[in-house]
Amino acid sequence: MRHRFCSLLSFFASKKKSPQLELPEDICRQFSLAQIKAATNNFHPDSIIGTSYFGSIVYKGTMDDGTIVAVRRCGGSSGGGVSELQLNEVKLLCQLRHPHLVSLIGFCLSEKEMFVVLEYMSRGSLAHVLYGKDHVPLAWKHRLHICIGAARGLHYLHTGAKHAVIHHNIKSSNIFLDEEWCSKISDFGLSKLLPLSTSKALTRIDTDHAVGTCGYMAPEHRVRLLKEKSDVFSFGIVLYEVLFGRPQYDSTLPEEKQYLLDWAMESLSQGTIYHAIDQYLKGRIAPECLNKYL
C-alpha cells in the first residue's frame, strides 16, 4: 500500500499538460467507451439519476456482467474537458477501500471526457433521504446508524493510511446509502492526500479562492488552510441536518433560522434546542441520548 501512496504523491507533483491515467488492471478496471455506452443505453436521458460536482451527469448503468453501477460523465459533456480534479478522484479512490466509502469500479478516459464507474447506491444521498421530495421521516435509531457509518468512513480517511486524506467536501449530498442503508462517503474530486510531514498539521489549499460547499466549510478555508478538523467541522453540520431534518441553508425560513449552524447555536445557548429539532423526532429521543449527541 505504501508504494501506491508514494506514486500518488508523484502524480500530484507532476505538471503534465495532457491528463494521463495509467493504473494497473488489478487496482482499477479500464472500460472502453463502447462498454460505457452500452451500459447507459447510449447515455439515454431515462438513465440519468443525478448530478455531481462541476455539473457532471450521473447515469445508472448495467455492465456486461450484470453489475448495476453509477456512471459519472465528466468533462466533455459540459465543454470543459477532463480536469486534474477529476483525475484526482480516480487516482485517490484506487488507493482507498473501506465499507463506508463508495467503491470505484473503473473508469474510461477518452480524448475530451472521462467516465468514472462507481458502486451504485440505490437509496440515493443522505440529503435526499432527510429532506428530499416525498421523503419518509427516518427513526432516530436509523439516523444514528447512518451517522456512525459515515463517521467510520471519515475516520478511515484521516487515520487508516500512512498519509491522511482530507475529503474537503463533506456534506449530506456526498453521503450515499445502499439498499441495506449502509452509509458511504463519495465525491473525492476536491480531496487532498497530505504528505507524511504534514499529516497532522495545516496544509495550504493551492487555489486563489476557497473551494468546497458554502455552509459546510470550516473557518480556516477563508485563509486557504486545510486540516483533518476541517472535515470534522463539515461533518458536524451534517449531524445537525440529521437532527433538524433540514438543509444547512433554507431561504424559505425566517431570517434567523435560515442558516442551520447559527440557528442550532442560538437554540443551544437559549436551551430551546429540543423545540427546534425535526418535529418527527420530538418525543422519540431520550433526553440523555440527545444530550450525548449534542
What do the predicted segments below correspond to?
Residues R2-L294:
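Conserved eukaryotic protein kinase-like
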